[in-house]
């Protein structure tokens, strides 16, 4: 549950003293939160158990009353997930974390933990399309108002806050617009108004590039599906409690932490928000991160530093190369001095500038779509943060349902291509781009996307599964 207090070994029922905490980030990725397994497993075991045995009736009562932390039921407590939570809390500089089923679940659980019917919250307009839809539609269905701020000016965030506002939400680097807001300035606004600042740090890669809590952010969320897992195999989300917001100073605004039945602030202090997420919201909604998924994410974390170093190196080189290519109209990369938020990148990012580049082709919408279809190795998909290079044409996919005015305000132009640079040999990435550029110049449209090796078309897949007659009409 927490970095400071761990009350579970492999069976979840014994206290373990904190004997050694690795100091360096790269070492923490492999060892933080791991405790000896009674069977000697070197890897974090997968505890695929729905429930966990109580030592006694009294022990069960202590666990359910949260007077002792331990494993109860895998909907909201599991030893494998617990290791992931501890590791990510430590990497982000927080005091506790809550693992959930996906990045979208992390958003919903966070909103539900802090708001109720009639409340509102403020969000940057520059957020992931899925998050925007959750805030604009799902929150509205729950009787909660989201107030979007389109500018970068902290004063505009301040102007949107009233006595029913429960938090401000932003992204470290916005997806896909590559906008970087001034975390410290917005944090000052929030704390002056008595509300926490929440940051989606998915692009910050679990603290490798950015640790928002070091800059005044109170709560961090991730889509762990992306760079944390790093291989496109597992969906998951994480919520990290920075332990920095004083819920005790604002009992009227946040009564859920002062309910006389649970007394979260009185009992758990700096960890009150994480406890509410895990033992109240997650318990009641069941947005559960499974033990196998948690182990997959832990395996991914072990190589995160090595991957992110290569991601950043490749991205910087590809951005420079694209900028010189005649067919490319523009390039948006926060590591370049001409990016409008480059100073923010220098202030808040370390070890590199991430691995996401946006660029546009001369020829607009059609050229962008044709380019994506012509690629042979690079994969067209909605995902990000994979070890493999991924690409997307947002205007025809993730942002297709938005109006042209909305897309323009979000910086999603018709020609925009979002590129998540992988860790392949950069010569191969360039070679695939070059052959696709040539097809765009020739105006040649590929009806079926080629791939390295043989691919099965849908009728071939059906035939393999059901026999030749099953796919004939």
Swiss-Prot record:
Keyword Kinase: no
Disulfide pattern: none
Modified residues (N6-(pyridoxal phosphate)lysine): 226
Classification via InterPro entries: Cys/Met-Metab_PyrdxlP-dep_enz, Cys_met_metab_PP, OAc-hSer/O-AcSer_sulfhydrylase, PyrdxlP-dep_Trfase, PyrdxlP-dep_Trfase_major, PyrdxlP-dep_Trfase_small
Disruption phenotype: Significantly decreases loline-alkaloid production.
Keyword entries, A-Z: Alkaloid metabolism, Pyridoxal phosphate, Transferase
Cofactor: pyridoxal 5'-phosphate
Pfam families: Cys_Met_Meta_PP (PF01053)
Enzyme Commission number(s) of this protein: 2.5.1.-
Keyword Transferase applies: yes
Pathway: Alkaloid biosynthesis
Recorded GO CC terms: cytoplasm
GO molecular function list: cysteine synthase activity; O-acetylhomoserine aminocarboxypropyltransferase activity; pyridoxal phosphate binding
Use case: Loline alkaloids show broad-spectrum anti-insect activity, and different lolines may have different biological activities. In vitro tests of NFL, NAL, NML, and semisynthetic loline derivatives with long carbon-chain acylations on the 1-amine have shown that many are effective against both fall armyworm larvae and European corn borer larvae, but the effects seem to differ depending on the modifications. N-Formylloline reduces the weight gain of fall armyworms by deterring feeding, and does not significantly affect corn borers.
Entry's induction text: Expression is induced in loline alkaloid-producing cultures as well as in planta.
One GO process term, biological-process aspect: alkaloid metabolic process
NCBIfam families assigned to the protein according to its UniProt record, in alphabetical order: OAH_OAS_sulfhy
Function: Sulfhydrylase-like protein; part of the gene cluster that mediates the biosynthesis of loline alkaloids, potent insecticidal agents composed of a pyrrolizidine ring system and an uncommon ether bridge linking carbons 2 and 7. Lolines are structurally differentiated by the various modifications of the L-amino group and include norloline, loline, N-methylloline, N-acetylloline, N-acetylnorloline, and N-formylloline.
PANTHER family: HOMOCYSTEINE/CYSTEINE SYNTHASE (PTHR43797), HOMOCYSTEINE_CYSTEINE SYNTHASE (PTHR43797:SF2)
Family label: Belongs to the trans-sulfuration enzymes family.
Protein name: Sulfhydrylase-like protein lolC2
Species for this entry: Epichloe uncinata
Organism taxonomic ancestry: Eukaryota, Fungi, Dikarya, Ascomycota, Pezizomycotina
């Amino acid at each position: 549950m927490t970095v400071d207090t761990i009350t579970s070994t492999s069976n979840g029922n014994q206290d373990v003293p904190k004997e050694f905490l690795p100091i360096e980030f790269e070492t923490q990725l492999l060892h933080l939160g791991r405790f000896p397994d009674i069977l000697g497993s070197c890897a974090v075991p997968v505890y695929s158990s729905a429930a966990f045995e109580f030592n006694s009736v009294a022990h069960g009562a202590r666990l359910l009353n949260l007077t002792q932390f331990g494993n109860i039921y895998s909907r909201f407590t599991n030893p494998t997930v617990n290791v992931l939570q501890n590791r990510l809390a430590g990497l982000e500089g927080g005091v506790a974390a809550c693992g959930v089923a996906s990045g979208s679940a992390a958003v919903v659980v966070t909103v539900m933990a802090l708001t109720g019917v009639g409340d509102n919250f403020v969000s940057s307009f520059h957020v992931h399309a899925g998050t925007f839809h959750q805030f604009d539609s799902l929150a509205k269905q729950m009787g909660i108002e989201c107030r979007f701020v389109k500018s970068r000016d902290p004063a505009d965030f301040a102007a949107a806050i009233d006595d029913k506002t429960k938090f401000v939400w932003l992204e470290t680097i916005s997806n896909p617009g590559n906008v970087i807001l001034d975390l410290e300035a917005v944090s000052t606004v929030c704390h002056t108004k008595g509300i926490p600042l929440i940051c989606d740090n998915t692009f910050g890669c679990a603290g490798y590039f950015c640790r928002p809590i070091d800059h005044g952010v109170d709560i961090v969320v991730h889509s762990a599906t992306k760079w944390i897992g790093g291989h496109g195999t597992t969906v998951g989300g994480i919520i990290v409690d920075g332990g920095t917001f004083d819920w005790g100073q604002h009992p009227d605004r946040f009564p859920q932490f002062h309910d006389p039945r649970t007394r979260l602030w009185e009992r758990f202090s700096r960890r009150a928000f994480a406890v509410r997420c895990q033992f109240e919201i997650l318990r009641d909604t069941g947005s559960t991160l499974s033990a196998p998924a948690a182990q997959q994410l832990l395996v991914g974390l072990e190589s995160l530093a090595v991957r992110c170093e290569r991601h950043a190196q490749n991205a910087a080189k590809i951005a420079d190369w694209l900028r010189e290519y005649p067919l490319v109209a523009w390039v948006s990369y926060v590591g370049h001095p001409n990016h409008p938020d480059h100073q923010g990148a220098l202030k808040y990012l370390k070890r590199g500038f991430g691995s996401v580049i946006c660029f546009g082709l001369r020829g607009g919408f059609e050229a962008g779509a044709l380019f994506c279809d012509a690629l042979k190795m690079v994969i067209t998909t909605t995902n990000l943060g994979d070890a493999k290079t991924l690409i997307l044409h947002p205007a025809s996919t993730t942002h297709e349902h938005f109006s042209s005015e909305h897309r323009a305000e979000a910086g999603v132009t018709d020609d925009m291509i979002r590129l998540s640079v992988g860790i392949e040999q950069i010569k191969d990435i360039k070679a695939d781009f070059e052959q696709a550029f040539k097809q765009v110049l020739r105006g040649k449209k590929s009806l079926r996307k080629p791939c390295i090796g043989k691919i099965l078309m849908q009728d071939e897949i059906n035939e393999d599964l059901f026999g030749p007659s099953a796919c004939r009409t």
